[in-house]
């Protein structure tokens, strides 16, 4: 056999060995660790037998370390003995998780007048009904007055936390900025789509900033900039997710997030430690203290009876959660019932989808779901920020509420309810549909809100069981808490914004429970609706719900929590306790105090040792080494906070580095070595062939038969 033929099998065997030996996470677990400010994290890691990896970009005193797999017991013991001395406050295992894109499958005189008026020559503009709907006048974003006034999103950057942006697309080249962009999946600067289904981010970006040229259609805010933060092309850890949501948060103004946990009617998932703190960090320190604007798609699980209050990203008070309405003002099949969504924007349904950009310089007519609705809201926010850059993240949410347009819907279960503040609210559409002209008009003269305040009720212990009790079947329970005038005054409360409710209800079929919150005015928010596919047997363990339905409603009076077993007593569980929190605008902005965000996020019985995160169907490991009780024995009297302060976590005020300082992944190492070995193999083969040919040419010709004779 020719020696060169042996190289292939030998190389394959060697590479297989190389891959198995190079994977750093093959034998190690990655952990997030928080240390005391004065502690050297490398020394602290060594003190517990771990290897230091790198700092977390966005959070001070938070670092990543590696521990050998299977060493949890010994590590815990070591931490208990030496962790506090080493200055370690908290340890949490990092588990890569998938985040799911929230996509959905599926010329006349007026139109010509509109396009000619604005000089739009894009060939597919006639298909962008969400911009100008000539078939159903008024069923669009109402952009004429905004564009006539010359507002196109200048000096605003929308960052798409997604699967990348094709910034070479002729519709996006001018809008793209590398300043706030990064590929967190491949750890490189350019977030170009690489996989066959990396289309989502490019489509979302085109909705906002597609150029007015002769390609595809146009964007809502064509002079805005777009940045790409690529995270959706592989499972990612909580730490990396948090870095993406804080990346470039002085240059990126809006973070458009059309993704979340699975919309299957079964999942219940929330941000873990680092991402929770990144959201807090963003609203406190982003945009020079005005707050990053986080826009989240509400979810596409309507046909599974899902509810966005089972998603800790969309039910966060820091998120502007956007639902969808179709071209005929019907409820799309994928639309979720949810008390946490502020407003709806146009998207797919009734045989029409959103026309936008697609990778490789192409266009698509099939973008949809709440994935398409959220970028439209981001675009409208960009239009407003271009003329009012002083608006805070809470101002944007207020203007969203006050400018929303309720509408008549052919859908029978739209169910608009008038609130005491004079708004109309639907659990399908929020406060109505987004109207760009109304939003910008309200924003122009908006008086910025005072700093945030809060009132936290004591934990209400109920401790009553569902099911058969003393020959009686218990299926309904009600618990009450009275907010007094004195509490309102001591809490420095002026206007109600968000209401959150934390519950602890172990139940052996979570999907059978319905949870409602009734305000003193009798307005009911559906916090948890029945989910027939949710067979989880743990119930709600310290899960926090949120509602915006009570915005600007008088908070004084009796608040009721109603918990119903919709199975009619077929299942068992216990309503253990609940806690009400009211968030709003302060009366006296000079009377400030640090906000209790992080205290509220920590479980009330966190103790030294491994703790399983309750706010998720996934299990993560946490170790808190400075035992802190966060249970409340009386209502919390608060004042307000400046947008840059908190007493519970150290928050960086500096801009994250333009490029993350990350270690090369084992895939990159293997790829480099593979390339090097293949190059060497080809080089040797060529040299071998050349030498063989050379010696063959130099060798004397073989003797003929006559010469042999």
From Swiss-Prot:
Residues 128-440 form the Peptidase S8 domain. One of its GO terms (molecular function) is endopeptidase activity. Residues 23-82, 83-102 form a propeptide. N-glycosylated. InterPro entries: Galactose-bd-like_sf, Kexin/furin, P_dom, Peptidase_S8/S53_dom, Peptidase_S8/S53_dom_sf, Peptidase_S8_Asp-AS, Peptidase_S8_His-AS, Peptidase_S8_Ser-AS. It is a single-pass type I membrane protein. Glycans are attached at residues 155, 463, 471, 620. It holds the Pfam family Peptidase_S8. The keyword Plastid does not apply. Disulfide bonds join 216-363, 308-338. Its EC number is 3.4.21.-. One of its GO terms (cellular component) is membrane. Gene3D superfamilies: Galactose-binding domain-like, Peptidase S8/S53 domain. Residues 103-668 are lumenal. Residues 449-588 form the P/Homo B domain. Keywords: Calcium, Cleavage on pair of basic residues, Disulfide bond, Glycoprotein, Golgi apparatus, Hydrolase, Membrane, Protease, Serine protease, Signal, Transmembrane, Transmembrane helix, Zymogen. It is an enzyme of class 3 (hydrolase). Residues 694-709 are cytoplasmic. Membrane-bound, subtilisin-like serine protease that processes the P-factor precursor and other precursor proteins. Essential for cell viability. Cleaves substrate on the C-terminal side of dibasic residues. Belongs to the peptidase S8 family. Furin subfamily. This is Dibasic-processing endoprotease. It comes from Schizosaccharomyces pombe (strain 972 / ATCC 24843). The gene is krp1.
